[in-house]
Amino acid sequence: MFLTATALAVGALAGGAWTGSAEASDGAPAEDQGFSFEALVRKMKDKASGAYDPHTPELPQKFLDLDYDQHRAIRFQPERAVWKDSGSNYRLQAFHPGWLYKESVELFEIVEGKARPIHFTGADFAYRKPLNPEEFEGIDLPGIAGFRLHHPLNTPDYFDELIAFVGASYFRALGKGDVYGLSARGLCIDTAIAGPEEFPRFTRFYLERPEKGAAELRLYAELESERVAGAYRFTVKPGLNTIVEVDAHIFLRGDVERLGIAPLTSMFLYGENDRLGFDDYRPEVHDNDGLLILRRNGQRLWRPLRNPDKLALSFFGERSPAGFGLLQRDREFDHFQDTEAQYQRRPSLWIEPVKGWGRGHVMLAEIPADKEIYDNIAAFWVPEGDAKAGSEHRFSYRMIWGREPEPGTELAQVISTSTGHGGTAASDADPNLRKFVVEFQGKALSELGADAPLKPRLTIQNGALKHKQLQRLEGGSWRVVLDVARENASQPVEFILALQLEDADITETWMYQWSGNT
């Protein structure tokens, strides 16, 4: 359920360039209304006390009947972008409704403290073959599928895509030089439990009209589903790493088994640690290659991602984490060899709590996938305690999208994880004996000679260590080689590994899970 729904919600974005938008309504229509974030929070709290109304503006049947190719043939007219002639650093374009996007959203522009609707018509879009443009002439759009903001991110004379909101509560952003990769969500409810997942959706957006030359943009959103109502404030700050500050007020209508805060959604098909079963010229295929968690005491946990044989869940108990995120550490084109997907340019995303989040855990869900069109990785924060009907929750955090968004460190980092059958080159393959090769690199290690009293700090659960070797490689990186026998194939083998000098960690902590074949 999770895999399919996630893929449907964001798969169209992965397909390529969309555009769209219209001019904001002129004059002062009757719908103009005073706006403040405080009032929006009160509104959503009041809505949470009543039943959920899933009704959205009804779409014309011709929109509902669009298939994938027809929907992709609809492109926005760039010259009709909102704020195009305002001298602003931002332009807004809309995604056309239809195909998978049968629930429309509404957009409002905030001017001088008042919210006015932004209206779109068929004139804002180009209806290309195989569609007949005449069938869409003069048509009004009762709502849109979502929108994206453009900004001169890479060069001063071109408005690049910066951030896009489309499908449920999904959105994604870019840092300088990036191409779209992983997505974020406003909230996730009951992800990877025995029952169905619930997908809250952003139903209305309110965007402050950006001042001429303004560096940042602020927008607000209403979030709703059967068991939740929420008010969100986003402050977007483009740059080498694009920062999105989030202030989320969440009100529960019903009990929730697993409340996921700051959810991240990504794709890992195969990599150097896990590529069994893929006959592909590309050495690696993934949006991100690991989960990083930064603890308040400075300890850094690095968990390489996998594409498991069956659903795999990992839980990392924390008390007010300093941050967590899905990273793409591998930046070498030769490691991907994909001139179209450009996986080496996919952004990492770092979540940094603005205020203490208290006790809870970071959860990582890894879901089997056989194609790169499926997003099969999820990571999010689960606060401690019950999420009961009538409860209120507020979380503020900073999202950092880019090549290296995480804080710097003096600790050496894991630069590769490789696996294969255990034993020697002459050994027969044994499904219950596996080799793990972990390489660490950093100044703290490169300055050490081969005779340094460096030692591994190693813990293995549900497995037995058969062989261990520590090697200094040319260039100053260090490699740990482990042969491990599995005690029970039905139980995952868990690893914790760091390198120590004088009983103190000088590397981040590598964590891994071996289940099934990998």
Task: Give the predicted meaning of each segment.
Residues A221-Y270:
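Acidic, contiguous internal or C-terminal segments within carbohydrate-active enzymes
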Residues V105-I110, G325, L349, L497:
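Short polybasic amphipathic segments
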Residues D69, D140, A164, V179, ...:
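A contiguous, surface-exposed recognition patch within enzymatic or periplasmic domains that forms
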Residues G181-G239, G358-D370, Y374:
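Extended, loop-rich substrate-binding clefts of extracytoplasmic carbohydrate-active enzymes
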Residues S25-Y68, R75-Q77, F95, H335-T518:
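Terminal accessory/anchoring regions of large secretory-pathway or extracellular enzymes
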Residues M1-A24:
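N-terminal export signals
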Residues G50-I193:
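Solvent-exposed N-terminal domain segments of exported/luminal and surface proteins
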Residues V105, L217-L219, G230-F234, V244-V246, ...:
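Hydrophobic residues positioned within well-ordered beta-strands of beta-sheet architectures
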